[in-house]
């Protein structure tokens, strides 16, 4: 799980060159409209049918802030620098895969736009980079295509494009033995059409290692090919769906491991294990090496972890890579301060507690480059998400200092706070408070339930599982603050600033869409704080004030309800809770949002990375 920079942006990872010639045929589904043909054939084309006007594109780009991350890598050894180059190459591959996972026409659109030399074409290409695909977020927080392609369905491109939730549920009900495969974290669902089945079999023949690592897969596909049918659904692991890309990434990760092994054998071990994971789709070996390893100057989040993009089932992970340079002194100081995790777990408002590993690997880093799902200003990450891996090995927390402490980003947060709050509270927010709230948000993912009372994973809640998990983590960061103040971890002023940061987190500049887990859970907290009189709204000024004395109890009570919903695993109860607390009042919320929008110079952020040079994409 992760947190993103800036309290106003959409957690949809679309917030925020030409296509890969080796891209698997299985995901090279071309949907060419007349508009795309114009784009592809006319580098200096005028506006094509179906694409946004220059004014529409400019409205977004005028509100887009470019953040350039340029950490010093001078301290790296020669081998580490070679490893960086190899990992950046893997990141570019993952970027292609991620974009193709999210939209079936993405790479075709990107290739066409990259060839445009006219000003409007370049603007559309920047929009593509901002959104990591051809679907944009408007200033009114609506989503839609800005070129002539179909809108993306909830399942994006990891399910059949025309598959509905009703059809999938019906199929699983009729074929319960297929449930695990059809809901698997790292697999693509397909229709059993003969041409598709033949392509999958051809890839298994091309890469015998995949056949060996996935026993029974070839026999299942061969069986389906003897009686193909569009109405039959089947799933293939990511390593087969993106075979060319994963085999190439496997080789590059091993080359990176070779380069770094003389100076950091533990990081090399992680890279080798993760390379193998990309072909097996079982991340345990890599995650174990990642969590238990003590790396020197580099770290990297590599693979498919987060499920935010899957709006159909909420179970499928999307690819990302985050390459990080370690801030060693800060990391060492932070680790020494984080003690007593079991006491914090036992203090949560539930009768069910688990045994936690006290020594959580936590590090402070500078982002070298992000790709795919990790791109767009992630401030921190706590992984892995799978409960059984966290129970066996714990988790690792990655704090991205050059995003969290970026002065331009914090200025945006401070401006939002000033626009929303009464003047008496103007000085209560600090950058350090955001840092510590983010840290303990990530710890919050580690604490609390990771299984329902019946022993099922939290995905039993369905697509709303991510929303509840993110809310739980938010609330844990605020709930444990009182105990951390008692221990001397926070001063009284720091505690107040942390609470202010928790309020900032809830504020919205537009009404969230129901499918936005981050924004919806923030709105729900805002409404809860209003209901419990932690927040008061002045209709005359459209400003908010805070009663800090009510804060802890309000957080405790909401956390208790969220944990209870997770433990129950009741999809309908969760949806009802979200509907109840996710309401929007145009005068109250709309008034505050209008104040925020009025002072916001920027609404979107486009991240660029010095390490990528001129080849930003």
Residue ranges and their predicted role:
Residues 355, 563-617:
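Extended, compositionally biased alpha-helical segments that mediate assembly or anchoring
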Residues 478-574:
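Long, well-structured alpha-helical subdomains associated
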């Amino acid at each position: 799980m992760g947190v993103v920079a800036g309290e106003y942006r959409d957690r949809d990872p679309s917030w925020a060159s030409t296509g890969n010639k080796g891209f698997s045929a299985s995901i090279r589904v071309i949907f060419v409209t007349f508009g795309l043909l114009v784009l592809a054939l006319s580098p200096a084309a005028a506006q094509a049918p179906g694409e946004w006007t220059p004014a529409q594109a400019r409205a977004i780009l005028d509100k887009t802030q470019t953040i350039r991350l340029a950490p010093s890598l001078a301290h790296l050894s020669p081998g580490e620098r070679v490893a960086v180059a190899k990992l950046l190459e893997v990141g570019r591959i993952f970027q292609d895969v991620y974009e193709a996972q999210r939209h079936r026409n993405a790479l075709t659109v990107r290739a066409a736009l990259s060839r445009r030399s006219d000003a409007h074409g370049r603007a559309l290409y920047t929009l593509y980079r901002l959104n990591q695909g051809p679907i944009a977020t408007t200033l009114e927080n609506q989503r839609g295509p800005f070129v002539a392609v179909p809108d993306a369905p909830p399942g994006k491109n990891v399910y059949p494009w025309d598959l509905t939730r009703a059809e999938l549920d019906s199929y699983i009900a009729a074929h319960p033995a297929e449930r695990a495969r059809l809901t698997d974290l790292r697999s693509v669902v397909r229709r059993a059409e003969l041409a598709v089945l033949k392509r999958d079999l051809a890839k298994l023949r091309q890469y015998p290692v995949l056949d060996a690592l996935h026993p029974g897969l070839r026999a299942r596909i061969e069986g389906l090919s003897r009686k193909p049918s569009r109405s039959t659904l089947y799933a293939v692991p990511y390593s087969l769906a993106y075979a060319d890309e994963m085999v190439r990434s496997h080789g590059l990760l091993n080359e990176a491991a070779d380069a770094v092994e003389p100076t950091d054998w533990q990081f090399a071990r992680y890279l080798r294990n993760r390379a193998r994971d990309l072909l097996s789709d079982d991340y345990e070996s890599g995650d174990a090496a990642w969590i238990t390893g003590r790396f020197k100057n580099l770290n990297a989040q590599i693979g498919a972890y987060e499920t935010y993009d899957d709006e159909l089932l909420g179970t499928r992970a999307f690819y990302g890579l985050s390459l990080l340079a370690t801030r060693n002194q800060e990391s060492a100081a932070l680790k020494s301060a984080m003690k007593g995790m079991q006491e914090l777990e036992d203090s949560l408002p539930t009768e069910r507690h688990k045994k936690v590993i006290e020594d959580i690997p936590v590090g402070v880093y500078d982002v070298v480059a992000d790709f795919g799902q990790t791109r767009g200003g992630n401030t921190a990450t706590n992984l892995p998400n799978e409960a059984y891996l966290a129970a066996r090995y714990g988790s690792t927390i990655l704090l991205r200092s050059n995003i969290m402490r970026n002065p331009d980003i914090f200025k945006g947060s401070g401006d939002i706070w000033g626009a929303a709050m009464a003047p008496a509270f103007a000085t209560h927010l600090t950058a350090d408070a955001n840092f510590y709230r983010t840290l303990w948000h990530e710890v919050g993912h580690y604490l609390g339930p990771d299984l329902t009372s019946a022993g099922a994973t939290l995905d039993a809640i369905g697509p709303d599982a991510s929303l509840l998990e993110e809310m739980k983590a938010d609330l844990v960061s605020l709930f444990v603050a009182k105990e951390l103040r008692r221990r001397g971890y926070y001063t009284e002023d720091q505690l107040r600033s942390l609470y202010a940061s928790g309020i900032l987190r809830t504020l919205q500049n537009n009404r969230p869409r129901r499918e936005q887990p981050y924004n919806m859970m923030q709105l729900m907290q805002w409404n809860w704080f209003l209901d419990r009189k932690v927040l008061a709204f002045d209709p005359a000024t459209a400003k908010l004030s805070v009663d800090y004395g009510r804060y802890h109890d309000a957080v405790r009570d909401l956390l208790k309800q969220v944990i209870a919903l997770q433990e129950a695993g009741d999809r309908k109860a969760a949806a009802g809770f979200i509907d109840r607390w996710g309401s929007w009042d145009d005068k109250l919320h709309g008034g505050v949002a209008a104040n925020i929008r009025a002072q916001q110079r920027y609404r979107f952020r486009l991240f660029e990375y010095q390490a990528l040079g001129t080849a930003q994409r």
